[in-house]
Amino acid sequence: MILHYIVNYFINYTSFLLLITPILLFLLYSKIKDKFTNKPLFKIVVIFLFLINFLLIYARFVEPNIIVEKQTSIETGFKAKIVLISDPHIGAYNSTRFLERVIEKVNNIDDADFVVIAGDITYYPIGDLTTLLSPFKNLKRPAYAVLGNHDSQAPGPYIEKELKEALEKNNVIFLKNEDLYLEDLNIHVVGLGDLLAEEVDTKKLDEFKDVENLLVIAHSPDTVYSYEDIKPDLTLSGHTHGGQIRIPFIYKYFIPTKYGFDEGFYETEKGKVYVSSGLGMTGLPFRLGIPSVIDIIETY
């Protein structure tokens, strides 16, 4: 709990500094500009610092709050309209109000069959989890969730028990190496434990070797390479944040994957995989070049 408060204090403090830095730069410039009036390099440096600061402010306060919808069609053999949300990271960076906005948008999607929440639901949360995640209770469609590494102490606090209870109280079905059958859609859904937390039970998948219409939810897309003698029709994942700070030619080196996943659709030897770039942030509190996303996946 102490770590929770330290992380939140650090984020609030650095965010405050970002906001006041332009004022400090302006005051500094006003104070010393007469000494450097005839030096173009000085003006270039000042302009550069202002631009960098405003870019950081945009990446901290503006782009993370832009929520877009992305539509994708995938051939799977079963027909469904799935809303995929991932990595909301409610806690240090994203608030309950942010989650309310997400749920409002999800509820406005026509003809959705169900919602998948692909893990990393929290990020150093403070307070009662049931209250923090209460917007989930307003979902108009069934919702199925798995945990991510930040929900399973890899890294982060170990809050699995509390999180499971909070999700269930808010009408979200929690799956950890568990399955359910959606009879109306004829789809078998398996939700796996987190890969980084070493909680993936591949034996659970062995039960579905000869089953058609198999949908797997796994937080990290790398999980598919732990599948043994099975090839699901579709695996839904998150975890990558699409790089989060999407600087061309650089961001891919910082994506937490061993197999080159970024965001979007992949056809692999282990089956079809769709990776959401998600809604939240970890590490640096910035999101740039990759707005928060709600994925709408129509399978056929």
Residue ranges and their predicted role:
Residues 78-173:
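Membrane-embedded segments
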Residues 221-298:
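Conserved beta-sheet core of the metallophosphoesterase superfamily
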Residues 1-68, 110:
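Non-catalytic terminal accessory segments
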Residues 83-86, 114-120, 142-149, 175-178, ...:
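Active-site neighborhood of phospho(di)ester-bond hydrolases with catalytic His/Asp-centered motifs
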Residues 15-17, 68-73, 206-213, 217, ...:
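Extended recognition/assembly regions associated with phosphoester-bond processing machinery
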Residues 155-171, 183-218, 224-226, 287-288:
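Binuclear metal-dependent hydrolase catalytic cores centered on His/Asp/Glu-rich metal-binding motifs
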Residues 90, 121-124, 149-153, 180, ...:
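Solvent-exposed loop/turn segments at secondary-structure junctions
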Residues 73-83, 172, 179-190, 209-212, ...:
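Beta-strand-turn-beta hairpins that frame and shape the catalytic cleft
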